């Protein structure tokens, strides 16, 4: 299992959006977790936000060293393969309203049949959502996922 240090800063703003990391910074915080693991150092969301670029509404422009997958076909198997390589996976899902949320998938502790509930997550917005199924219960549409 991979572990990270994560916190949502309340006052640090996202680009020129006027919104704070606590309000719209789940993607920034998830990238900070991913980069903390990749570099072996602790990178906090406020420091990460200064390294990233954002649209005027606060949407992040993804780091170029990350590969995006937008096809949800076979996503559990693909994510499992990345975890077996020792790489966490950043995962985004949406509500029917279009609202998005981002988490980091850190491991798999389910059985031999892959299920969303078997994937452990670090959720920058909730300590109660601890597996991928918890996220999909609230954000049922898979948006995309990233890995490095």
Question: Could you tell me what each predicted segment is?
Answer:
Residues 1-52:
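Active-site-adjacent structural segments surrounding the nucleophilic cysteine of cysteine proteases
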Residues 2, 8, 18, 87, ...:
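Low-complexity, intrinsically disordered short peptide segments enriched in small/polar/basic residues
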Residues 21, 41-43, 70-74, 130:
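Short coil/turn linker and secondary-structure boundary residues
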Residues 25, 29-33, 47, 74, ...:
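Extracytoplasmic/secreted proteins, especially bacterial periplasmic and envelope-associated proteins
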Residues 25-28, 88-93, 104, 119-122:
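Structural recognition of the beta-strand scaffold that forms the well-ordered cores
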Residues 35, 39, 96-148:
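Active-site signature of cysteine proteases
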Residues 48-50, 79, 135:
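Hydrophobic/aromatic residues in well-formed alpha-helices
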Residues 54-112:
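...with weaker cross-activation on analogous glycine-rich loops/strands in unrelated enzymes
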